[in-house]
């Protein structure tokens, strides 16, 4: 079990009052203006409306203040979503890219748009391809196969393009690392324009233009664009129009790519995604319309969360399980009947992806049960035969969530060649860890939080040992990243209207997460199964007010709390419209016994380190070393009540927060003696 600490953000009360007043005044003035009354409001009416708006906007102002946004002007600009999109020409080499593309159009050359097999790559390809078509260009598009070609521009792809007589390649969402491939293209007489958003290597590829906001010498102000975002800027530059005008034509594709690639939803991305989601709701693209219909979102407001959990996985599934061309065909499809067929096919592929992912996840869990010593590894390296390489990265992510440590999942083919995909946790550089074992690998790549590798089967045991040796030296105690809580709440002060006001903070995503609230000293009043028992719906009561909240992935029989327990809950809040009217709803992220602070997660990390043989300071040892009487107390508690072995938080709470580490060590000792 991973014990996670919570971090409640500090709150400047004076700044909160000032910001609440500013937001309330703005809202009141808008209400007065929209009322279009014949006479200006009286002072009494204005004051009454202002007081109501102060109450309704207090929750919104609290979240903004907790996130450090205390300047009223900055806050009101953010809430209005009015951040301007910067001039595309500020991107270094954008002028060179446009000049070469214009010349190709004028001279009737065939332009090849070369993309990638993920959502960002597919949407970027469709976006640029369709825009060039609209400009009258002769254009083709090409996507690599995940298994056959691998990521990015390859020599085989360049040779194929050359053999078809094409002389200009424009990459989207890839190419920044294609140094050798760029040289090869030049040898064949092919001009190359690179548009990408990934971190460049020390030496840039030699190309006609290299457009990447993350170039060291790039002069554009915003560095958080995804591949589709860069392609969007290229289209605006080619048209010579403000990027805001381009939003009406391809903002939907740019928004899907941005959200799916987990780019920060701040700055220009916030403006782009906000506009793109509105366009997506009323899209005139038959392919996207069919996909929305397939996932039950037709005619409904589309959120960034809908893109992340419903739209993006289906587009991604094609590249993972089959061929990304299927997804590209859907996005660009203009025939509604054909679009419906393709959307249904993608849905079936995604279902297969989910089934395959679950099979591998269960196999990995069985491996851990058969070899429990792997649970002591700082970096978990798990391997199996013929696991589908398209989903091992997703499985690694799920295992990271479950174990709280870096995980690499490896599939072995019939030739003994292995491909691995790893995911990390904050504070642990997985790329550096893997790089320290480079002599055992065929190749590797990635970054601190995610990496991939290729290795021979016979080197896997040595790789596991070396990964953990490096981790023991460089990161002996791995603390779980705390769950950031924005604001403590009291249910009797939270209304449907105040929660609706939070919609102004959307779209939510990377660097702009859904607000997390801390509900303290709530009584667990009810537990109900959801989705055939896969999830739990809890009724939490605080004073005379209560809220129903769903805990996804927590079956009722595994819930480590009983009716009547007093708990603290970290949760999101939303509003749903029921036959009985609008009601508050919650989504539980974590649950602690009431009053249990950060000591549980902190001392649990020391216990894990002790079990792994990591040297601890005398002070750390003292914190977690139980006396004989402590072990006796724990034994009696275990005999008196059936505590869940997967979650001992309630037991730790009962025996005292300051004794958390001692309790966990005592449980471990009792497990070892049976």
PLM ranges: what are they?
Residues 1-48, 66, 70-80, 84-85, ...:
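Terminal, basic amphipathic appendages of nucleotide-handling enzymes
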Residues 3, 10-13, 17, 41-42, ...:
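Hydrophobic helix-and-loop "lid/oligomerization" segment in the mid-to-C-terminal part
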Residues 127, 206-259:
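Short alpha-helices
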Residues 133, 138, 270-313, 317-365, ...:
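Acidic, two-metal ion nucleic-acid-processing modules in DNA metabolism proteins
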Residues 158, 182-183, 667:
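Short amphipathic alpha-helical segments and helix-helix/interface helices
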Residues 167, 208, 568:
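Conserved acidic residues
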Residues 172-225:
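Histidine/acidic-residue-rich, glycine-tolerant segments that coordinate divalent metal ions
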């Amino acid at each position: 079990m991973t014990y996670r600490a919570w971090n409640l953000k500090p709150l400047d009360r004076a700044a909160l009052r000032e910001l609440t007043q500013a937001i309330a005044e703005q809202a009141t003035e808008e209400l007065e203006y929209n009322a279009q009354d014949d006479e200006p409001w009286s002072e009494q009416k204005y004051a009454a409306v202002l007081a109501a708006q102060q109450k309704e906007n207090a929750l919104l102002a609290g979240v903004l203040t907790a996130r450090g946004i205390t300047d009223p002007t900055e806050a009101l600009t953010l809430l209005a979503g009015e951040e301007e999109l910067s001039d595309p020409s500020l991107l270094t080499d954008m002028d060179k890219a446009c000049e070469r593309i214009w010349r190709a159009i004028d001279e009737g050359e065939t332009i090849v748009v070369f993309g990638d097999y993920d959502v960002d790559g597919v949407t970027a390809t469709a976006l640029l391809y369709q825009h060039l078509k609209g400009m009258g260009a002769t254009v083709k598009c090409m996507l690599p196969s995940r298994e056959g070609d691998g990521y990015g521009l390859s020599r085989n792809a360049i040779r194929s393009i050359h053999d078809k007589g094409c002389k200009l390649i424009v990459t989207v969402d890839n190419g920044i690392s294609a140094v050798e491939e760029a040289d090869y293209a030049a040898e064949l007489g092919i001009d190359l324009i690179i548009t990408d958003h990934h971190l460049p290597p020390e030496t840039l590829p030699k190309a006609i233009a290299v457009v990447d906001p993350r170039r060291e010498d790039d002069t554009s102000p915003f560095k958080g664009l995804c591949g589709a975002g860069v392609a969007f800027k290229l289209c605006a530059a080619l048209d010579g129009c403000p990027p805001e005008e381009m939003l009406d034509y391809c903002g939907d594709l740019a928004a899907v790519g941005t959200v799916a690639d987990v780019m920060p939803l701040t700055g220009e991305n916030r403006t782009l995604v906000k506009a793109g989601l509105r366009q997506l709701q009323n899209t005139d693209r038959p392919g996207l319309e069919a996909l929305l219909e397939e996932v039950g979102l037709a005619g409904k407001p589309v959120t960034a969360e809908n893109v992340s959990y419903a739209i993006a996985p289906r587009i991604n599934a094609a590249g993972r399980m089959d061929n990304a061309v299927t997804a590209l065909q859907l996005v660009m499809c203009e025939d509604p009947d054909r679009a419906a067929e393709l959307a249904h096919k993608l849905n079936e592929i995604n279902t297969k992806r989910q089934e395959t992912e679950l099979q591998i996840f269960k196999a990995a869990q069985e491996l851990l049960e058969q070899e429990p010593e792997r649970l002591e590894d700082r970096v978990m390296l798990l391997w199996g035969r013929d696991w589908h390489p398209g989903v091992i990265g997703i499985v690694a992510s799920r295992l990271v969530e479950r174990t709280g440590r870096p995980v690499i999942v490896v599939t072995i083919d019939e030739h003994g060649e292995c491909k691995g995909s790893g995911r990390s946790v904050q504070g642990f550089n997985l790329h550096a860890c893997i790089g320290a074992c480079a002599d055992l690998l065929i190749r590797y790549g990635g970054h601190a939080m995610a990496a991939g590798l290729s290795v021979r089967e016979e080197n896997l045991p040595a790789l596991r040992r070396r990964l953990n040796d490096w981790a023991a030296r460089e990161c002996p105690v791995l603390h779980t990243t705390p769950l950031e809580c924005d604001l403590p709440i009291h249910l009797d002060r939270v209304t449907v209207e105040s929660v609706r006001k939070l919609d102004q903070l959307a779209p939510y995503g990377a660097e702009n997460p859904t607000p997390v609230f801390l509900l303290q000293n709530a009584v667990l009043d009810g537990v109900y199964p959801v989705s055939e028992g896969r999830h739990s719906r809890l009724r939490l009561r605080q004073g005379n007010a209560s809220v129903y909240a769903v805990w996804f992935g927590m079956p009722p029989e595994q819930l480590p709390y009983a009716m009547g327990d007093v708990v603290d809950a970290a949760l999101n809040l939303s509003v749903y419209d029921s036959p009985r009217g609008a009601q508050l709803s919650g989504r539980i992220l974590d649950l602690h016994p009431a009053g249990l602070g950060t000591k549980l997660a902190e001392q649990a990390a020391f216990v894990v380190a002790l079990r792994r043989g990591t040297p601890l300071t005398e002070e750390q040892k003292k914190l977690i070393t139980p006396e004989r009487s402590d072990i006796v107390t724990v034994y009696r508690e275990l005999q008196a009540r059936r505590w869940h072995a997967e979650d001992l938080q309630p037991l730790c709470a009962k025996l005292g927060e300051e004794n958390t580490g001692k309790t966990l060590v005592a449980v471990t000792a009792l497990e070892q003696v049976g």
